[in-house]
């Protein structure tokens, strides 16, 4: 955030989308080199402490969240994910089906914030 603060002009915009909830941390995070997961409040506090004002803050990936949480829970119990991450090629039809919830959420996010999800999104402005 320090570098964003340095390079952004005064009142410049910053859009952050990051992984949510430390308890969802898994081997997938290691494979995609994700080091941190945040709650909406923890990321918002970090944003505020680095000279930014939050304009919009929400969770995302809410519709598929129960499936993801269940998968991570089962994977952690049975130590399944140690071989692969979730970042693998997907069948085109399945990919399209899984894309539909993102379209629905993008429409919802125009008018409302989502209460939970596997990602946190914050739009902020530099002070």
Predicted regions mapped to residue ranges:
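Short, glycine-/aromatic-enriched active-site segment of Class I SAM-dependent methyltransferases
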Residues: 14-36, 40-46
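A C-terminal cap/extension of S-adenosyl-L-methionine-dependent methyltransferases
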Residues: 64-127
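Short secondary-structure boundary/capping segments
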Residues: 6, 23, 112-114
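A short glycine-rich, Lys/Arg-flanked "PGG" loop and its adjoining helix->strand segment in the class I
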Residues: 1-13
